[in-house]
């Protein structure tokens, strides 16, 4: 990774490159910045901070933020603050998220024709830029193939957040109908010993272009909207209740995808996050090595819920207690 020029130099470069056509596209802009800065593989946190400083931006890990980051202009200089408490994987993503916002504002100041994007789109654009910058395509595609699209292993090996990785998969596998969802445990009230399925929230929903219109993956699992809760009796519900990964494969339902639902467990063996991946059956090889490694419970709609004995949500459950596929 080489040291780039100043922030202004990059903005002028982005506006001149192919007549500025990349300036309004966060993924292409991220790729352009990656090439400009010479990022050939995912940088560690030190290199990330050094890169931002080399642009003339003052960057600092601060204790006043519980998580995330922020940016501001003060005394003629841009500043980026990020939470000192966060893990490096999260910090890197947040830093590049904030960097996009700084670049975006500067592009507008250089060229008012570059319209400023407002929330909630600004945050989504910034996330896409961060993922595109942090993950060089050829390097990432090789890593995805080796791990079987394992977000956990990729996160550990590349020091990247699961959010960043899911977004990157969606950006790099545009030719297949891929869907990825990240659920987080976010209870409204006091944290209870028995976690309820309605306390999980879909914080990240990634769809490639060919999956945009898909609303239901199978009779037991819909594609959630962002900030929605899992259904009682869904594949996510079964994975959370049982604390084990679940793999849906059906041979008698046409065009049924392979759906891998993986709960991540805390030290106390309680689910705190769930990762859902859905790929076409004919593309299931892209998750096969992960499946072999984590050994999920198979499900195909012909049997009762694998977590039935631990279920506390039998009322309104969409999974037939006696087994069988409940077609909606």
Regions found by a protein language model. Give the residues of each.
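Active-site hotspot residues in diverse enzymes, especially metal/ion-binding acidic/histidine motifs
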Residues: 1-328
